[in-house]
């Protein structure tokens, strides 16, 4: 499809304060009308408002993003009239506000996140509406807002087209399609609106798989294509295989994995099969990796790296994926081979892993899932890590902690005082999936460092089998 340029006939005054201008509100169409309807949007605007006094609107020519959103929160919020933004599977400020509204109405803790209690309420309300013949009517009407919001960070990257796939429960009634168009308001560019086309496809998982052959035709040729698979990737899932084969990058977030160890093994299988994979949770480790590397910048410290034979990593109990990926990265850089793997569950989730170094030294690593009162948005964030040696003369000790009091347990064990180097990781707001995705779509292809680290992590799990 070629780039189109249009004049905006009636730009509302509200545009000056809104972050998104709705060029075309979501409209129900049949599957074979998608391209024709999108073309019609541009043609209808192209013959209006030719006075040249208003900002023009141009369809972005950047990338296509396919979002597979198995978690039904956004769809339910829209169907019940709480949410009036695009159904894109991306958690943005408007989603959080809608969740808080539901929670306030039903006297639940106002977290702005999809807690289990909130989901239960949404499902019950949706079921009541279906029985009364009104369920889902807001799924369209509730989206007809004058100023809907694409998740801010994604909008700033000006995607050309977002295709959102929403598997839903219930009877198989085929696939429903909607198209719409939105233009993020860029403060630095008031003369032109860069617009994004939205295609939303919803139906049962079986129905979506049936029409999977049509989806590649909806991707815009000549532009990078990203698949954000917000479920556990299944190498045997037909729809996943079809989409992964045609996208430049397949993006997952292991912080949401229900069974992190077996799910990370699945990721390794995909890498071995040649899938260009990216894990947003891996990107959350960047500051920890950078500080660890900086700790051994000096020649003396670098020479002592081989003396490291004790590793302790504390993480927020609930998901060990970050801790395991960090350990996989460290082991891959220092060429350690895993030889044993043990787990203990209790107040703390303890994992003990033994490695053999290149010079046949024994290396012991302990991962501890620490219970915390407020987990926050990301389950399993790193809290602290300690690298040390059984050789008291070795200058290789390092302790790195998060700024949220992460060193308390390390200090109890004498680690922070005895370490040769102590550093803190500043808590970063961009650790949420929305912002990390915004960074990820600026690059594509295979990530060798991630793949090597994942390979070592997978070898650890295989010791348990």
From Swiss-Prot:
It comes from the Bacteria. InterPro entries: G6PDH_assembly_OpcA, OpcA_G6PD_C, OpcA_G6PD_N, Peptidoglycan-bd-like, PGBD-like_sf, PGBDSf. Pfam families: OpcA_G6PD_assem, OpcA_G6PD_C, PG_binding_1. May be involved in the functional assembly of glucose 6-phosphate dehydrogenase. This is Putative OxPP cycle protein OpcA. It comes from Nostoc punctiforme (strain ATCC 29133 / PCC 73102).
């Amino acid at each position: 499809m070629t780039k189109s340029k249009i004049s905006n006939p009636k730009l509302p005054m509200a545009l000056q304060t809104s972050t998104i201008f709705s060029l075309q509100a979501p409209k129900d169409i049949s599957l074979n009308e998608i391209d024709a309807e999108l073309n019609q949007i541009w043609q209808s605007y192209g013959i209006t408002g030719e006075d040249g006094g208003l900002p023009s609107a141009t369809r972005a020519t950047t990338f296509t993003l396919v979002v597979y959103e198995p978690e039904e929160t956004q769809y339910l919020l829209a169907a019940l009239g709480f949410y009036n933004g695009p159904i894109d599977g991306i958690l943005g400020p408007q989603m959080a506000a809608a969740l808080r509204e539901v929670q306030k109405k039903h006297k639940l803790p106002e977290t702005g996140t999809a807690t289990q209690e909130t989901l239960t309420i949404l499902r019950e309300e949706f079921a009541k509406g279906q029985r009364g013949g009104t369920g889902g009517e807001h799924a369209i009407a509730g989206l007809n807002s004058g100023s809907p919001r694409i998740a801010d960070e994604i909008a700033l990257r000006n995607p050309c087209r977002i295709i959102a796939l929403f598997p839903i429960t219930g009877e198989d009634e085929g696939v429903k399609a909607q198209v719409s168009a939105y233009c993020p308001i860029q403060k630095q560019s008031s003369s032109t609106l860069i617009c994004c086309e939205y295609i939303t496809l919803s139906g049962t998982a079986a129905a979506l798989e049936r029409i999977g052959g049509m989806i590649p035709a909806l991707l815009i040729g000549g532009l990078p294509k990203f698949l954000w698979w917000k479920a556990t990737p299944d190498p045997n899932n037909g729809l996943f295989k079809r989409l992964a084969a045609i996208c430049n990058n397949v993006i997952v977030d292991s912080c949401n994995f229900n069974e992190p160890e077996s799910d990370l093994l699945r990721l390794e299988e995909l890498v071995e099969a040649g899938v260009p994979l990216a894990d947003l949770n891996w990107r959350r480790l960047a500051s920890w990796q950078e500080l660890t590397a900086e700790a051994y910048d000096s020649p003396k410290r670098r020479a002592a790296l081989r003396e490291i034979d004790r590793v302790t990593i504390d993480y927020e109990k609930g998901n060990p994926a970050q801790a395991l990926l960090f350990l996989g990265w460290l082991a891959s850089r220092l060429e350690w081979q895993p030889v044993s793997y043990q787990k203990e569950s209790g107040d703390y989730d303890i994992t003990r892993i033994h490695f053999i170094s290149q010079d046949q030294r024994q290396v012991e690593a302990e991962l501890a899932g620490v219970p915390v009162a407020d987990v926050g948005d990301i389950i399993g964030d790193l809290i602290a890590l300690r690298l040390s040696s059984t050789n008291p003369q070795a200058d290789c000790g390092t302790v790195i902690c998060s700024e949220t009091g992460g060193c308390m347990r390390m200090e109890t064990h004498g680690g922070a005082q005895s370490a040769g180097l102590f550093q803190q990781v500043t808590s970063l707001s961009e650790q949420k999936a929305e912002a990390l995705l915004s960074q990820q779509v600026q690059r594509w292809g295979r990530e060798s460092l991630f793949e090597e680290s994942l390979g070592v992590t997978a070898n650890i799990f295989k010791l348990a089998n």
